[in-house]
Amino acid sequence: MNREIDIRNREHAINICKLAGKSSYEVWLSAGTTLVNAASMLSMLTMVGKTASVVARDDNDAQSFLRLVREMV
């Protein structure tokens, strides 16, 4: 599963990191050739100003994933 989001600024990246950390499954962000764990603060700060795909395994609950992405936006 994946959805695109824009990571606007440092505070937005921190919020995404917190939400990903609370998730019951692993959440990743992909931008170009970069793939980072969304729960990693250091990794998230490298994504500021980029459009990224929020990625999770397909065997996770789709509705839960969509709710998570809506909170991240």
Regions found by a protein language model. Name each.
Residues 10-11, 34-35, 60:
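Short beta->alpha connector loops
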Residues 4-30, 42, 46-48, 56:
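Compact, glycine-rich, soluble single-domain proteins
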Residues 18, 35-39, 43, 64:
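Non-catalytic helical tethers at domain boundaries
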